[in-house]
Amino acid sequence: MENGIKESPVGLNKNGALAILPTPLVSEGHKNHKSVLNSLTSGALAGAVAKTAVAPLDRTKIIFQVSSNRFSAKEAYRLIYRTYMNDGFLSLWRGNSATMVRVIPYAAIQFCAHEQYKKLLGSYYGFQGSALTPIPRLLAGALAGTTATLLTYPLDLVRARMAVTQKEMYSNIIHVFMRMSREEGLKSLYRGFTPTVLGVIPYAGISFFTYETLKKLHAEHSGRTQPYTFERLLFGACAGLFGQSSSYPLDVVRRRMQTAGVTGHTYGSIIGTMQEIVAEEGFIRGLYKGLSMNWVKGPVAVGISFTTFDLTQILLKKLQQISHIQR
């Protein structure tokens, strides 16, 4: 086992003579099953840790995004301070339970889908066992984000509603679903879906592309196959910065459309929403409201997310190897 040579079992054949029996191999299906489970587990943990770390900043950003009030770092600080003084420290994480209900499946699906799309595209383009070229690398990230968004979108909408409303309006996640379905119709659960997907495609594509590219360049120049933890955090931070900056206006639009039912506005389309925001608040102040906060929140969250995923993947693989050796 330790020298890398697999010993084949010896037994008797049908004639009674000694013969080498075929070695029982782990099926490809079993390997893929373990790989998928590892990716789902690592992705779920990565999403939960990252989002919890930046939840107060995320909630503050959403509140500014869905209002016409001018954003500034000073006003953001005042909002956080007022929330803390009026409602207590834990109120800064209001809506985080809804966030976890969305983020855990979203991150699990996104990271798992990314691993599967990498294999699929690698097989298609003939890059199996080696790093993908830039276009397939970008495509794998975009497809992963789109898949996760399609499957978990209503949970994102619920999180946005809980973040911008008083506790008395929606008591829990189920209450949000029931009240929206009854008062606004089932279609309301996918309100803002189009700008979300249009924003996710460049965001996820560029984020995964940047992170994978930086890791590849690092391996080529350093001679180390695995970056240190602080290097992973730095690569993830760069990925988050580029990804979120590229899709931010669509993020503002989707938040306005998601929360239209509780803010008194009636946003009907992406173009119409953009025009109304620009007319009322200006192009930069409206469509890029809260971006400076995202330049703090986004890189931190994405850095933690990618790093947690990678390290959890490595840990799970080591545990499985130890378990296999002990057998």
Swiss-Prot record:
It is found in: Mitochondrion inner membrane. It is a multi-pass membrane protein. The keyword Protease does not apply. GO terms for biological process: ADP transport; AMP transport; ATP transport; coenzyme A transmembrane transport. Its main location: mitochondrion. It catalyses: ADP(out) + CoA(in) = ADP(in) + CoA(out); 3'-dephospho-CoA(in) + ADP(out) = 3'-dephospho-CoA(out) + ADP(in); adenosine 3',5'-bisphosphate(in) + ADP(out) = adenosine 3',5'-bisphosphate(out) + ADP(in); AMP(in) + ADP(out) = AMP(out) + ADP(in). Solcar repeats lie at residues 34-120, 132-217, 227-315. The chain crosses the membrane at residues 36-56, 92-112, 138-158, 192-209, 233-253, 296-316. Keywords: Membrane, Mitochondrion, Mitochondrion inner membrane, Repeat, Transmembrane, Transmembrane helix, Transport. GO terms for cellular component: mitochondrial inner membrane; mitochondrion. Gene3D superfamilies: Mitochondrial carrier domain. One of its GO terms (molecular function) is coenzyme A transmembrane transporter activity. Mitochondrial carrier mediating the transport of coenzyme A (CoA) in mitochondria in exchange for intramitochondrial (deoxy)adenine nucleotides and adenosine 3',5'-diphosphate. Belongs to the mitochondrial carrier (TC 2.A.29) family. This is Mitochondrial coenzyme A transporter SLC25A42. It comes from Xenopus laevis (African clawed frog).
